[in-house]
Regions:
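C-terminal catalytic "cap/lid" subdomain
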Residues: 1-54, 58-254
Length: 254
């Protein structure tokens, strides 16, 4: 499954030079997204077709993860596509997404998709090789190759955002930890390097990246859904200490 942004940027580029009326941020995002999504998916269609691969477009919103019914319907759609040899290309539907319920960025979306689809691995492509043990511009700074469960990275994470994204390395790390805790391997690598995906698959030991070691033991589908639904709570549940122990215990089944 491929998660890709770029619709807004494509739409802005496509309409550059046109005399547009004064638009607020929401109107502009909706316009550029509607125009750009066509251009973006056509580009992917052409690139994959040249290699004999079929692709399909899936537009989603954060609200689609809120209810179990929509969550499973979305999952089923992508499962059918994969079973039929079609690669889902997923993007947020910026034309109708409510600002207050937008994904932080596509790193968050990719984490939710990886969890929903019970993927073996999530590869997050950035513009650097991974998480460094210092400033990437400082001589001698190296990429942290592996992040074990519980390792503190707070001293190494910078909060700067990319010029085109809504998040940054902090968001990537937060999502990576969450997904790794669910038993899924997470890799942060440099998407600007040629053949990076092939190298990660065929030469994992030699390819520079940051790999988050997954927790042992699986997590149920329901627990994964709940783990990514913290923003959709509609009430409160009060538990006593004994109930908390039972729910955290190994015998808990949901």
């Amino acid at each position: 499954v491929m998660i890709s942004s770029g619709a807004v940027a494509c739409g802005r580029s496509e309409l550059r030079g046109m005399q547009l009326p004064q638009l607020d941020n929401v109107d502009a995002r909706q316009l550029f997204s509607a125009v750009g999504q066509v251009k973006l998916i056509n580009r992917y269609y052409d690139l994959f077709r040249d290699r004999g691969i079929h692709v399909g477009q899936v537009l989603t919103m954060k609200e689609s993860f809120a209810t179990r019914r929509h969550y499973l319907n979305q999952r089923n759609c992508m499962m059918v596509m994969l079973q039929c040899g079609v690669i889902p290309i997923v993007n947020e539907n910026d034309t109708i997404s409510v600002t207050e319920l937008m994904f932080t960025d596509n790193d968050e979306l990719s984490g939710m998709i990886a969890s929903m689809m019970d993927m073996q691995a999530l590869i997050i492509l950035s513009n650097i090789d991974g998480i460094y043990n210092g400033s990437p511009s400082t001589p001698g700074t190296q990429v942290i190759r592996e992040v074990e469960q519980g390792k503190d990275l707070s001293d190494y994470i910078q909060t700067e955002k990319s010029g085109f994204g809504r998040g940054g390395m902090l968001t990537k790390t937060t999502i990576a930890r969450k997904v790794a805790d669910e038993g899924i391997t997470v890799i942060i690598a440099n998407g600007k390097k040629d053949h990076i995906l092939v190298d990660l698959l065929q030469h994992p030991a030699e390819t520079v990246c940051t790999r988050f070691i997954p927790a042992e033991g699986g997590v149920s589908s329901v627990k994964k859904w709940i783990a990514h639904s913290e923003g959709f709570a509609k009430g409160e549940l009060h538990l006593n200490e004994q109930a908390v122990k039972v729910l955290k215990g190994q015998k808990a089944v949901s």
